[in-house]
Amino acid sequence: MAVKKYRPYTPSRRQMTTADFSGLTKKRPEKALTEALPKTGGRNNRGRITSRFIGGGHKRLYRIIDFKRRDKSGVSARVAAIEYDPNRSARIALLHFADGEKRYILAPEGLQVGATINTGPEAEPKLGNALPLRFIPVGAVVHALELVPGKGAQLARSAGTSVQVQGKESEYVIVRLPSGELRRIHTECYATIGAVGNAEHKNINLGKAGRSRWLGRKPHQRGSAMNPVDHPHGGGEGRTGAGRQPVSPWGQLAKGLKTRRKRKNSDRFIVTRRGGK
């Protein structure tokens, strides 16, 4: 995928870039694999804001993605189309299985329409195939990695991300995550061969505020621009500093505070933290 630039015939067009959608082969989603996605406006079931600066945006249909892929072991599938998904940065691939079922998966980099994909312990470690980590060779690049066997993919799902298999020890496999963290994952966890496609997504420049609103993002208000009743940084005559360490609206330190729980159960699976610590 390439990034498309525009002539600067307006100020916002000067910086704006978009994705080149030439790699897509189908415009309309598979109706049976979509469902309604109601807007929340960042509110919970009590109507209170739990996630700020969310609201508006273009209406979307949610594409149901198969993140488990276990129940199709031994059933081959053909890649029927590569599609756009407004709910994620990656592209998605429509699979037609030999038993007649259709499913969506994340489209790895280099996957072509017409390719054959397999799932299960007997599958070869080639692009798009999903299999347990115990059968994936050391050095292989994978994505859509499970943390718990059978729970479904949780790691390396966004555009351009991947995980590398570093080594194996008894019932665990050591992998390098996109953050640089080395972590033990159970050998029965499934992963898909290859890196997630649409790697140029990180180079997209929205160019104008309105395009951010189309995505459902509202302006992020600075605390120093608020009143004292609304934020610890608020108030003062004219532009004034916070007068304290930067904090959140609820008083929690905003820079450098470690929020991970001490003695968390999953600490024993982390070999090296991100940053080499």
Curated annotation (Swiss-Prot):
NCBIfam families the record matches: rplB_bact
Quaternary structure and interacting proteins, as annotated: Part of the 50S ribosomal subunit. Forms a bridge to the 30S subunit in the 70S ribosome.
Statement: the UniProt record of this protein carries the keyword Signal: no
GO molecular function: rRNA binding; structural constituent of ribosome; transferase activity
Keyword line: Ribonucleoprotein, Ribosomal protein, RNA-binding, rRNA-binding
One Pfam family per UniProt: Ribosomal_L2_C
Gene (name only): rplB
Ranges where the record places region Disordered: 1-20, 210-277
Chain intervals with Basic residues compositional bias: 210-221
Biological process annotations from GO: cytoplasmic translation
InterPro entries the record matches: NA-bd_OB-fold (IPR012340), Rib_uL2_dom2 (IPR014722), Ribosomal_uL2 (IPR002171), Ribosomal_uL2_bac/org-type (IPR005880), Ribosomal_uL2_C (IPR022669), Ribosomal_uL2_CS (IPR022671), Ribosomal_uL2_dom3 (IPR014726), Ribosomal_uL2_RNA-bd_dom (IPR022666)
Protein role: One of the primary rRNA binding proteins. Required for association of the 30S and 50S subunits to form the 70S ribosome, for tRNA binding and peptide bond formation. It has been suggested to have peptidyltransferase activity; this is somewhat controversial. Makes several contacts with the 16S rRNA in the 70S ribosome.
Coiled coil: none
Top-level taxon in the UniProt lineage: Bacteria
Protein name: Large ribosomal subunit protein uL2
Record carries keyword Secreted: no
One GO cellular component, as annotated: large ribosomal subunit
Homology family: Belongs to the universal ribosomal protein uL2 family.
